[in-house]
């Protein structure tokens, strides 16, 4: 399926940025829907084919009459109030996100798109194995699940093809400084020691560029109604990821493993089944963690004006 124009909410996050780059590199026009006043607007490229529209998620319903109706696919990656644990567990705020997702489906139809692809989270579900616990009683996870199921129903009613991608953990340029890997990078680049738990949690990290390709393949080849788990398919202890990150910056720097306690109810093994995504779309990651983290470090260095090992 060949697309000429796509629309993306959450375009300044790591997945959104990578998806923008993916389509622009292939000559596909992109409408990036960005929160007004976003400090991350500078992360977007400035090149032909990219149109930036400033609109908060609560106002998505106003865009149908303002944007062209020649779009082919809509990617809803935006989600408000995920900055910290307090907002992640605010029931009212996340109930609003469910409504925003349904407005995104309506906008998908108004823009002439044939397919809606939404970004979910591993927190929506329990693991695929008895010892693979990923579910937390958090408003964020509950709302993500509800948004995914209700948007599927609305797509069915509106005769739109629907796919939902449940992402475990991605990393790459554009990620928030507060995530574990970005905290690790930022601290090590200052020559300081980052503090962590023991880092024994088994984790799956996927480079944002690979994740973007997975979402593009969902839009092009995904099975209607499918909910795909999106990850690399490889589990490693978090402490290994931290060590590889440190080694890419300066192997002599210390890591403060075990200096922080685990949170209550901390899942120790996060995993899911990536085989349906591979079977339906042919997706497989192309970037090793070692390669992806080097690119991410370079991006942070450019932003901070520092050099590896400094």
Which residues fall in each region the model found?
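Conserved catalytic Lys-bearing alpha helix of Rossmann-like short-chain dehydrogenase/reductases
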Residues: 98-104, 143-151
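SDR active-site strand-loop-helix element
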Residues: 9, 33, 74-80, 116-122, ...
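C-terminal substrate-binding subdomain of Rossmann-fold SDR/epimerase-dehydratase oxidoreductases
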Residues: 192, 196-310
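NAD(P)H-binding glycine-rich loop region in Rossmannoid oxidoreductase-like domains
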Residues: 54-96
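NAD(P)-dependent short-chain dehydrogenase/reductase
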Residues: 139, 145, 152-203, 208-212, ...
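Conserved glycine-rich Rossmann-like NAD(P)H-binding loop of the short-chain dehydrogenase/reductase
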Residues: 28-38
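N-terminal Rossmann NAD(P)H-binding glycine-rich loop of SDR-like oxidoreductase domains
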Residues: 6-26
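Conserved Rossmann-fold NAD(P)-dependent oxidoreductase catalytic core, especially the SDR/UDP-sugar
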Residues: 74-76, 99-139
């Amino acid at each position: 399926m060949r697309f000429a124009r796509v629309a993306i909410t959450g375009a300044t996050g790591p997945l959104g940025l990578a998806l923008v780059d993916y389509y622009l590199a292939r000559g596909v026009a992109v409408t990036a829907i960005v929160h007004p006043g976003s400090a991350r607007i500078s992360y977007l490229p400035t090149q032909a084919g990219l149109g930036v529209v400033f609109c908060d998620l609560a106002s998505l319903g106003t865009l149908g009459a303002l944007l062209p109706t020649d779009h082919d696919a809509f990617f809803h990656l935006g989600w408000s109030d995920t900055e910290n644990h307090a907002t992640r567990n605010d029931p009212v705020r996340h109930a609003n996100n469910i409504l925003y997702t349904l407005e995104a489906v309506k906008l998908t139809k108004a823009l002439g798109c044939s397919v809606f692809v939404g970004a979910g989270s591993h927190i929506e579900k329990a693991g695929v194995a008895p010892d693979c616990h990923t579910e937390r009683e958090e408003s964020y996870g509950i709302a993500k699940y509800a948004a995914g199921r209700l948007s599927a129903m609305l797509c069915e009613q509106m005769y739109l093809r629907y796919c939902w991608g449940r992402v475990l953990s991605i990393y790459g340029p554009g990620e928030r400084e507060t995530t574990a890997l970005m905290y690790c990078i930022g601290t090590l680049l200052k020559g300081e020691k980052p503090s962590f738990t023991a880092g024994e949690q088994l984790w799956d990290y996927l480079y944002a560029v690979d994740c973007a390709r997975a979402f593009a393949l969902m839009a092009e080849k995904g099975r209607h109604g499918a909910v795909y788990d999106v990850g690399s398919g490889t589990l490693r202890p978090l402490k290994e990821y931290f060590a590889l990150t440190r080694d890419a910056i300066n192997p002599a720097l210390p890591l403060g493993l075990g200096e922080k306690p685990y949170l209550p109810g901390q899942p120790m093994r996060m995993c899911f089944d990536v085989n349906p995504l591979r079977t339906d779309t042919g997706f497989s990651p192309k970037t090793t963690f070692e390669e992806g983290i080097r690119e991410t470090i370079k991006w942070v260095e450019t932003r901070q004006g520092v050099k590896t090992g400094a």
